[in-house]
Curated annotation (Swiss-Prot):
Species of provenance: Desulfotalea psychrophila (strain LSv54 / DSM 12343)
Reactions performed catalytically: (R)-4'-phosphopantetheine + ATP + H(+) = 3'-dephospho-CoA + diphosphate
UniProt entry tagged with the keyword Metal-binding: no
Binding positions (substrate): T18, K50, L84, R98
GO BP, one annotated term: coenzyme A biosynthetic process
Source organism, top-level taxon: Bacteria
Enzyme class (EC, first level): transferase
Family from the record: Belongs to the bacterial CoaD family.
Protein name: Phosphopantetheine adenylyltransferase
Amino acid sequence: MSLHTENSQPSIGVYPGTFDPITNGHIDIIERALALFDTVIVAIAVNGQKQPLFSGEERKEMIEKCFEKEKGRIIVKIVPSGLLVNFAVEQGARAIIRGLRAVSDFDYEFQLALMNRKLVREVESIFLMTAFRWIYISSSLIKDVSKNGGDISDLVPKHVERLLEEKYRP
C-alpha cells in the first residue's frame, strides 16, 4: 500500500546513491520503497570525492534493466551537483529514502536527515533497514571481490556481474 490517496497527488520518494554498481541490497530497498510510494526516483549521485568504475549513463542503464517491468513507477535520473533535498523538491517528492546496513550508517544518515529537515521541512527522510541477507554487501566490496576473481553471482543481477567482468577482465 502506498502513501497515495485518491484525493492527493501521487506519492514520490527519491532513493539516492552512487550505485557503482547496483547490488541486490539496493534492489531490495527499491522494491520495498515501491510498497510505500507510487513512484520511486532512483537518483544517481555524482560524488566528486569518488572515482566511479561506471559512468553515470552506464549506471542508469544498469538500474533501468533491473526494473524493466516497473517502467513508469521507477524513474532513474542522474543528479547534477547540488543539494539532494532541492532535487527532491524539484521532483515533487515527499521523502528521501535511505537504506541502513548497520548502526554506523545511522549516525551519518541521521545528520543528513536533520540538515535536510532544516533546509526543507516538507521533505521527510525515511530509513529502511537492509534485509539481513544483504546487510554485509556494498558496491565497494562487490567491486573488490569481482576485481580479484571472487564469486559475486548471488550478490548482483547477472547483467551487472557481466559488466563487472568486462571492466576487470576485458
